[in-house]
Amino acid sequence: MEDYIILSKCGQGTYGSVFKGIHKITHSLVALKRVTDIAQEDGEPVEVKYLNQLKNLSNIVNLRDHFYIDKNSVLVLIMEFIEGDLWKIMSNPQCTLSLGQIKNFTKQLLEGVKQCHVNGIMHRDIKPANLLITTNGVLKLTDFGLSTSYSKRSEKFLSSNVVSLYYRPPELLLGSCIYGPEIDMWSVGCILMEMINNSYLFAGADETAQLDLIFKLFGCPTEKSWPGVSSLPGYNDLFNKQQQQQQNENNYSKQHNNNNNNNNNNNNNNNNNNNNNNNNNNNNNNKYNNISTSCLQSPSSSPPIGGYASSLSSDFNSNEYNGYNQTFSNEDCLAISQKKLIDKFPHLVLLPSVLDLASKMLTLDPKKRINSLEALEHPWFKSSNDMDQIVPFSKDFTDLANRYIASTRQLQQQQHHHQQQQQQQQQQQQQQQPHQQQLIQRQHQEQQQQQLIQRQQEQSKQQLIQHHQQSVNQQQLAQQQQLAQHQQYNSQQHQQHHQQQHQQHQQHQQQQQQQQQQQQQQQQQQQQQQQQQQQQQQQYHQHQQQYHQYQQQYHQPSQQQQQQQQQQQQQQQQQQQQQQQQQQQQQQQQQQQQQQQQQQHQYQPPQQYNHQPPQHQHQHQHQHQHQHQHQHQPQPQHQHQPQPQPQPTPTPTPTSTPTTTTIPPTITTTIQPTISKSNG
């Protein structure tokens, strides 16, 4: 509200008020509508919902914005400002609408109604005050507070307390809760007649008076003229109460006549007069016998409408208004409606197109009522001769109209007389041909018997078919059960086989893991042995070094001994080379065997998996480790070291046992004197 300045108040309604305002930034005029009773549908205000659906249409008012004030208790709608409306124009005594203006406004009104109905929306409150007219003569529909959506002949219950009373159709006045967009077309017809006559078409003080005016003009509806009217709650309540009142009056008059006959035996003339008067009263009371008494129970959601019978006019059911007691087609009903309108408004004789369109929109039966698309295609909107013609209201015109009405009534009387003659001829023919009726009855009975026989045969056939279908269904069920059992058995066997293969595979993996652990243990043992051998070799080299030192100090080896030692060393080297070659060959063989084992131990599919324990190659591995020890043994080189003369040097053996060095006794004897000499 801070962006708008309120200039003046335009109007006040049941659910809020409308103000004229101006936008502070754009300086454009707007209409601000304050709504206190906010009706919502699908979590959104009704008027906002449907105005957004009908946005930017030519004959619908444009909604610019909306917001809440006073703690969301008041809804404010910002719409385009249009100062004039149709009610202000018609209520001005100095303003007289031409026939061209009436046609223009009616066409624009039908365009707006069509835009609503095409989008699945019923306005439910069409009246002149809700038809805004711009300075350019554009008519726009406004006030969608009572609008609702509908499906094609929706079966949901709706409120019957909608549409302003003067423009409310008869089905809503009779309490119907199932209706469609045809209720808007009745309102358009009332507005058209109001513009033509410059006065309200039906201006009842309440719902009862409104029904009275409608039925006075168009006659009392029956099941023949309006199928389904007797099921409306207001219809039953209306006519049943009237019949009860007439029966009570008849009973009272009969009792009164009996008392007069018993008490006034001497006054025969008076009694005869009283009886004649009572008979006349009874004849007058019989005018309600033409009203249909059949009724259906009304829906529980629609409240009954009461109080019609007590306030309807006395000539409500007179013969003058009972024009629908016979069976008529849609064209006959339109002709009767046109006649009734001409009787009340004689100047419509000179406006046949207007009369035709109005009678099609003001049909009592809503299913026979014209829709907005059909109304826009009416010939009245295609002609342009009456654009500037003023609606006639002169006395000469009324005389001409009365003459036309008298001539039409004479024609109707002649037609009625002709129909009576035809009925009499038909009755005579029926009396002359009693035998034909009997034959027809017999044929009818035979046809009924044949139909019964055919029904029995059809029933027997259906029973046989059902029995056959049951047997077929049972067989199919049995086959399905067998298939299911077979599938279960196959699945169980497959699962068992798969489990067995899985267990075998797990066992094989466990065995492989155990073998790998054993191999690791063997490798660790071999490593330990290799370490021990290396230690022994180191000790051996230390002893040899000590021994050579002793030899260098106390002896000079001979050349022959040196040559022998060299030969021995060469032989040892040759032996070591041969051993290395053998070890390489054994390693190659072991690698080939390991590759073969890996190929054999690869995982195969469960269906063709055959477990074969691997071949243990413990001996070959042991040999391989033993050869590996020989490869890593260091070879002593004694080319430039002195050798002892009497004894050969001890050589390292390729066994796993540790070697020990022995010193010859000659060396010990030589060492001792030297020590003693040095001591001395």
From Swiss-Prot:
Region (Disordered): 243-299, 409-444, 483-507, 597-680
Residue ranges annotated for the Protein kinase domain, each copy included: 4-381
Amino acid composition bias (Polar residues), ranges on this chain: 287-297
EC number from the UniProt entry: 2.7.11.22
Entry GO CC: cytoplasm; nucleus
Comp. bias regions, Basic residues: 617-631
Pfam families listed in its UniProt record: Pkinase (PF00069)
Active site per the UniProt annotation: 125
Keyword Transferase attributed: yes
GO biological process: regulation of cell cycle phase transition
GO terms of molecular function: ATP binding; cyclin-dependent protein serine/threonine kinase activity; protein serine kinase activity
Biased composition regions of type Low complexity, renumbered to the chain: 257-286, 410-444, 483-494, 597-616, 632-642, 656-680
Record field: compositional bias (Pro residues): 643-655
Enzyme class label: transferase
Catalytic activities: L-seryl-[protein] + ATP = O-phospho-L-seryl-[protein] + ADP + H(+); L-threonyl-[protein] + ATP = O-phospho-L-threonyl-[protein] + ADP + H(+)
Residues the entry annotates as binding ATP: 10-18, 33
Protein family (similarity comment): Belongs to the protein kinase superfamily. CMGC Ser/Thr protein kinase family. CDC2/CDKX subfamily.
Protein name stated in the entry: Putative cyclin-dependent serine/threonine-protein kinase DDB_G0272797/DDB_G0274007
Classification lineage: Eukaryota, Amoebozoa, Evosea, Eumycetozoa, Dictyostelia
